[in-house]
Structures are given as structure tokens and as C-alpha cells.
Amino acid sequence: AGLEAARASAERGYDVALAEAGTTLGGRVARERHLPGLSAWGRVADYREYQLSQKANVESYFDSELDAESILEFGFENVCIATGAKWRRDGVSRQHVVPFPTDGAMPLFTPDDLMSGAAPTGHVVIYDDDHYYMGGVMAELLIQKGCSVTLVTPAAYVSEWTLNTLEQHEIHRRLANMGVAIE
């Protein structure tokens, strides 16, 4: 959303200063493009990054974490803040609106942790209350890293929302063929 807001603003003639806290533009899409089966998603970020690079009214700043004071010092007339999305660690999701009780001794990993390189070993249980693509993709990633995986979902189907994109049967088949236990 941040890159698209910057691109659309530049297209409308606004001077745009794009401050990126890290070294890579594209937010979640830039991270998720490295997950199994999602490499094509990189086109979303690549297109916007290219469009921004062609505009004389756009300046990009990397490793530029800003606070409110820094933003005010710039003196911009309009400010759009895209802070990115983070996966919750406490189990709050679509079906569960209160945190799950957890055992502090048991390691918990979010998709953000796995995309950052952290990885469990051995048998892993994935609780998928996203119902779209992430649970299946995380299961595939962990199988590739040598884990055995049980995917648990409260939905009727694994990656249930992918019924709308006609991908659900293929996702289920692929996970079953990899040895993912689906409950």
C-alpha cells in the first residue's frame, strides 16, 4: 500500500519523499516473494519501484526510520504513513478475538519470524486462522527445511479462501503429497 500511495501521488504531480526503514522497498510483498510458490508476487513491488524510479518528483531514502518529530521537520503538506503489517504471536485472528494462553517455554513462530530466517526443527504444528494462502505456504516452507508438519485450521478446508481463486484443491493436493498432516 505504501509504494502504491507513493506511485499514485507522484503520478498526480506531488513531490514524494519515500522513507524506507530498511534496505528494500515493497513491504510484505517484497518479503513474501521469497516464499514457496509466491515468486511472481515480486512483480507487484518491482513495477511500483520501477515507476517511482522514473519520476523526477520522487526521492527515496533507505535505512530511514522516522518518528513524528522527524516527519514534522520535513514540513510536508501531506503525509502518508505505511507502517507495514505484522503477524500476531498471541493467536488473535479471524475466529479468535482473545489471545491464546501459551507456555513461555514453548517456542512460537509467526510468518514474520520464518520470513526473517528463524526456523523450528522437528515436528511443527501450524495453526492457520488466516484461511487464505499463508498457512499452506508456511507448511511448504517448513517441509522444505526438513520439518514434519501438522496444519490445523478451524475452516472447513485448508486455505479455504483459495476456493475463490480456484487454487484450493491444488494447494491441498500439494500439501498432502508433501506429507503435511491436515486437521
Where in the sequence are the language-model features?
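Rossmann-like dinucleotide/flavin-binding elements
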Residues: 1-25, 61-72, 79, 83-163
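N-terminal glycine-rich dinucleotide-binding loop that anchors FAD/FMN and/or NAD(P) in oxidoreductases
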Residues: 31-61, 93-106, 163-183
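Short beta-loop-alpha junction of Rossmann-like oxidoreductase domains
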Residues: 27-29
